[in-house]
């Protein structure tokens, strides 16, 4: 081991480094390096990935933690961490530098450098005349821990730079160490580094000029090359510095916040006290013996693993939400914990599902438990600010999410860097079918005109492939908080997020998990917002106060289940997707646990494991149910002998193959990543032999293993499904009994769910609910319920729907609105300051009470002549009426202004105008026979292409009577690519298929009718 690389930037030095940290650490090990320092610019974002790669691949190379800084254009250096104190110091330096600036920037001060007491400093001379001045300054403050880092990149002035550095070292008595200034793990990444540099500077590679690297010397180099470039003592000095650096990320220890413990309690005793209180609330009739045993088992393991603070922290957060009237629900593996149920973190009664605590906490796993809590998405910020206020910004921050290049951004950015016209890039992106599993995007690019024999074409494809997955920047996690007992910046650097009042750490959830650090997930859920708004509306209009618990106590309401069985579930949580709605009439849920199964079974795991059809056949009595043993029956009886949930796989491994709880959970984790690393196969022998030893047939053992592989990364936990089923039933109950309130709440909670406001309004109208247009005199910002003269409730659309109408405009409109309403448009013009606001109201036809039509309203908005004396004698506009817009023009204007229309559906309108050939409507399909030829026409309102569908795409078309489910096979989409990719109004000629109450059309011919809409563009929602 001849060398330690002490200056190496990964791709977490965004748009500079051209290799992943994992690639760098593996290549350094391959080249025989003693150590490698990942030193990204003012960042530690990549160090955990390198650390994990060493462990995963059992590498001998040592990782050194450090960071590269530019104090200014003349002074640059690397800081390395010899020990834990130096690491805390480095985190503090990075935090201070980042917090001084907006997101993505940093500003280091001279005081930051002067105050260093523990970090090792490698100064990197720039070759400028000011180097002597900076050497003097650095020597004054950091002499005992200061080196001169000599880089050799074989530029035209390399010999001059070499002499310059040696002179400085002699003059200031600085030891020299060899440094690579590494930006890539292999020389082949040079074109990518050029491309990244061009993206960073916003120009093409050809325009970079002197900013372009002239060679690939800033890659990890071989021993032979390094020995030619550097003196032996310079290489040896790198090893000496590496020997000083003993800090290891595994030495980081998380300390939980402690202020939640009242006097007289220990963390353990206070948790037990809260659980005792919770038992009385959750089990007023007394705790069943089996549940009590589970509670004691959980508490013992929580105490042993030293997790009480974690549970107390979550409990404190949800109690705050409860006090503030914010709806919340714990979900995920936490629903496997009776302790969480007693602490009111989760709402799933453990008597209703088979709880498996090993899925939540495992002694063998030795990791912090994962508790996800969803809060109303419109009020989650209150919870976040409570956490900041309680613990302070020094001790609480959000985890990061690494935003990486995906296909579209990669094509755009690489294409621009190579000088490809933006119109051509748009053409590529518009016509590439990413759902095509057989013809990759590379093949499709060639079909679209990219020349594979040209150098630019070859570079383009290669660079797009390489850059996909590269980090672009750090963003904030959806809600993962890290809270510590001491300053968080001593554990990990903290920086500003893009949102005001938010700070994030430089690690993501996977980094935290790798280091076994606690993360509190404060997530958001739109359905909780909708449910709360629905409850408030019910109380307002019916004087009935409801809660989720009130509804879930009525879990066997067959009227609700009949609605669900008919797949009348648009807007219903978790069972509103195309796939779920197709399964509902087949599975026919009739109780809460059926919903739990329903939510979990329409997942890639059960589908790939071939578990759906056996379950349905057994449920319908078409296939016998048998169990090889009583133990297996106890695990699988509730799902008719078919493993559907992750917990069942874990339990099967325990009862049938003799796995411990921790081993079984390791099996679950291997299942989650088996396609990536194949780790699940190391359990195959143990699983099958364990079953054979216990008397099970080889065929059964192998079938179970195949089902485990089928689950893959898509297996769904029962606890997760059980939590979701609570909200699914609650939202279905509200839709059935209070539809007007339900739709209004959904519309006021957008964006959420699968459906656009237009689709929700269409469904509300199909359910007989009157929907009233936006009106300048009656609307509010949000949609509201109003009572008609008939006594029925109707939905009045709100101002928030209008595109281009400002918040200030809405506020002024309402503040100054007279009790009797506005009498003329000129009144509104005097109140609204921005002409755009008045024009937006006119375009949305919000003046329909004051002007006969929107054209006339627009004219009056623009008409200022009567305000000028010269024109006061001209005839009034009323004597020269404008032509009224046609019904069709009104629909176009509605969609353009608000995204929906209350007028006649475009399909019906086009048919009346004679613009459509004969077709079958959605409400007529149930009269068509199985395998009959049909023609359907509708607006494309949804596309789904699940990963398990083998290239199949599921379209949702909407006509004036309802939704039509269309199945498009891959061969069809390839042959008719233009209509498949771009149609907004689509005609499908195909074969109707019927399975029970499930009807869909298998597409044969796709015809794009979008031109007939002449500007109408209801956007479809696409889900991949």
Curated annotation (Swiss-Prot):
Which superkingdom, per the lineage? Bacteria
Give the enzyme class.
transferase
* Chain segments annotated as transmembrane: none
Biological processes per GO annotation: DNA repair; DNA replication
Q: What is its main location?
A: cytoplasm
Keywords, comma-separated and alphabetical = Cytoplasm, DNA damage, DNA repair, DNA replication, DNA-directed DNA polymerase, Nucleotidyltransferase, Transferase
Indicate yes or no for the key word Nucleotidyltransferase: yes
What Enzyme Commission number(s) does the record list for this chain? 2.7.7.7
Q: Which reaction does it catalyse?
A: DNA(n) + a 2'-deoxyribonucleoside 5'-triphosphate = DNA(n+1) + diphosphate
Q: Which GO terms describe its molecular function?
A: 3'-5' exonuclease activity; DNA-directed DNA polymerase activity; nucleic acid binding
State its location(s): Cytoplasm
Q: Name one GO cellular component term.
A: cytoplasm
The function of this protein is:
DNA polymerase involved in damage-induced mutagenesis and translesion synthesis (TLS). It is not the major replicative DNA polymerase.
Task: Please report which protein family the annotation says this sequence is part of.
Answer: Belongs to the DNA polymerase type-C family. DnaE2 subfamily.
The molecule here is called: Error-prone DNA polymerase
């Amino acid at each position: 081991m001849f060398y330690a690389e002490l200056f190496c930037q990964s791709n977490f030095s965004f748009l500079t480094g051209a290799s992943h940290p994992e690639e760098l650490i593996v290549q350094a090990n391959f080249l025989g390096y003693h150590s490698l320092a990942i030193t990204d610019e003012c960042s530690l974002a990549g160090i955990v990935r390198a650390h994990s790669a060493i462990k995963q691949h059992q590498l001998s190379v040592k990782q050194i933690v450090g960071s590269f800084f530019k104090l200014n254009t003349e002074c640059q250096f690397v800081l390395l961490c010899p020990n834990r104190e130096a690491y805390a110091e480095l985190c503090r330096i990075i935090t201070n530098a980042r917090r001084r600036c907006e997101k993505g920037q940093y500003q280091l001060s001279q005081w930051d450098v002067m105050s260093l007491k523990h970090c090792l400093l490698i100064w990197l001379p720039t070759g400028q005349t000011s180097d002597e001045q900076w050497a003097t300054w650095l020597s004054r403050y950091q002499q005992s821990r200061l080196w001169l880092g000599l880089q050799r990149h074989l530029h035209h002035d390399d010999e001059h730079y070499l002499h310059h550095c040696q002179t400085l070292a002699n003059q200031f008595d600085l030891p020299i160490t060899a440094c690579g200034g590494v930006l890539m793990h292999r020389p082949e990444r040079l074109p990518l580094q050029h491309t990244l540099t061009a993206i960073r500077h916003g120009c093409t590679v050809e325009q970079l000029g002197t900013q372009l690297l002239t060679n690939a010397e800033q890659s990890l180099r071989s021993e032979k090359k390094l020995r030619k470039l550097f003196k032996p003592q310079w290489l040896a000095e790198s090893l000496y510095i590496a020997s000083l650096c003993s800090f290891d990320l595994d030495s980081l220890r998380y300390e939980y916040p402690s202020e939640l413990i009242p006097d007289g309690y220990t963390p353990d005793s206070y948790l037990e006290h809260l659980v005792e209180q919770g038992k009385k609330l959750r089990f007023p009739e007394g705790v069943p013996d089996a549940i009590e045993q589970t509670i004691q088992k959980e508490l013992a393991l929580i105490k042993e693993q030293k997790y009480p603070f974690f549970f107390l922290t979550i409990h404190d957060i949800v109690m705050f939400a409860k006090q503030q009237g914010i709806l919340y629900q714990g979900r995920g593996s936490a629903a496997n914990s009776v302790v969480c149920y007693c602490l009111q973190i989760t709402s799933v009664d453990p008597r209703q599902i088979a709880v498996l605590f090993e899925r939540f906490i495992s002694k063998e796993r030795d990791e912090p438990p994962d508790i996800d809590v969803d809060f109303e998405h419109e009020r989650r910020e209150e919870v976040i600010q409570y956490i900041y206020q309680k613990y302070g910004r020094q001790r609480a921050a959000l985890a990061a999410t690494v935003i990486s290049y995906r296909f579209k951004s990669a094509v755009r950015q690489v294409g621009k860097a190579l000088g490809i016209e933006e119109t051509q890039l748009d053409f590529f992106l518009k016509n590439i079918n990413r759902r095509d599993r057989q013809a990759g995007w590379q093949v499709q690019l060639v079909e679209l005109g990219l020349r594979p024999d040209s150098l630019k074409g070859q570079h383009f494809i290669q660079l797009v492939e390489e850059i996909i997955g590269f980090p672009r920047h750090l963003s904030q996690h959806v809600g993962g908080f890290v809270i510590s007992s001491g300053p968080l910046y001593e554990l990990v650097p903290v920086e500003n997020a893009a949102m005001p009042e938010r700070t994030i750490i430089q690690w993501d959830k996977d980094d935290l998990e790798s280091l076994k650090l606690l993360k509190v997930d404060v997530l958001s859920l739109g359905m909780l917002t909708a449910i709360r708004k629905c409850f408030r509306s019910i109380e307002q209009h019916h004087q009935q106060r409801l809660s989720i618990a009130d509804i879930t106590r009525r879990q066997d309401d067959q009227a609700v289940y009949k609605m669900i069985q008919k797949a009348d579930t648009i807007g219903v949580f978790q069972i509103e997707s195309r796939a779920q709605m197709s399964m509902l009439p087949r599975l026919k849920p009739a109780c809460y646990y059926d919903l739990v199964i329903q939510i979990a079974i329409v997942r890639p795991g059960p589908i790939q494991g071939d578990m759906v059809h056996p379950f349905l056949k057994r449920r319908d009595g078409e296939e016998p149910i048998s169990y090889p043993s009583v133990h297996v029956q106890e695990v699988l009886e509730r799902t008719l002998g078919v493993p559907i949930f992750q917990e069942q796989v874990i339990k099967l491994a325990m009862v049938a193959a003799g796995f411990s709880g921790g081993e079984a959970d390791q099996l679950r984790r291997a299942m989650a990543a088996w396609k990536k690393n194949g780790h699940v196969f190391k359990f195959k022998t143990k699983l099958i032999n364990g079953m054979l030893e216990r008397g099970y047939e080889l065929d059964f053992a192998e079938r179970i293993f195949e089902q485990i592989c089928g689950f893959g990364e898509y297996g769904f936990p029962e606890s997760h499904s059980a939590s979701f089923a609570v909200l699914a039933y609650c939202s279905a109950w509200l839709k059935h009994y209070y539809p007007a309130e339900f739709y209004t709440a959904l519309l006021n909670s957008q964006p959420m769910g699968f459906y656009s406001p237009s689709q929700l309004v269409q469904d509300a109208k199909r359910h007989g609910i009157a929907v009233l247009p936006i009106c300048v005199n009656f609307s509010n910002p949000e949609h509201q319920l109003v009572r008609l003269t008939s006594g029925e409730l109707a939905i009045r659309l709100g101002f928030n729907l209008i595109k281009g109408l400002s918040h200030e405009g809405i506020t002024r409109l309402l503040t100054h609105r007279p009790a009797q309403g506005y009498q003329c448009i000129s009144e509104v013009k005097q109140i609204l300051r921005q002409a755009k606001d008045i024009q937006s109201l006119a375009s949305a036809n919000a003046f329909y009470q004051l002007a006969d039509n929107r054209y006339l309203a627009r004219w009056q908005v623009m008409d200022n002549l009567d305000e000028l004396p010269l024109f006061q004698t001209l005839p009034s506009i009323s004597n020269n009426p404008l032509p009224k817009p046609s019904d069709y023009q009104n629909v176009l204007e509605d969609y353009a202004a608000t995204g929906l229309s209350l007028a006649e559906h475009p399909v019906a309108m086009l048919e009346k105008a004679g613009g459509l050939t004969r077709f079958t409507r959605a409400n007529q399909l149930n009269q068509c026979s199985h395998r009959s030829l049909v023609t359907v026409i509708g607006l494309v309102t949804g596309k789904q292409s699940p990963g398990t569908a083998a290239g199949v795409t599921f379209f949702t078309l909407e006509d004036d009577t309802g939704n039509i489910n269309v199945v498009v096979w891959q061969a069809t989409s390839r042959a008719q690519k233009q209509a498949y990719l771009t149609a907004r109004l689509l005609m499908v000629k195909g074969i109707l298929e019927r399975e029970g109450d499930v009807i869909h059309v298998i597409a044969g011919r796709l015809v794009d009718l979008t031109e007939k809409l002449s500007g109408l563009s209801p956007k479809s929602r696409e889900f991949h």
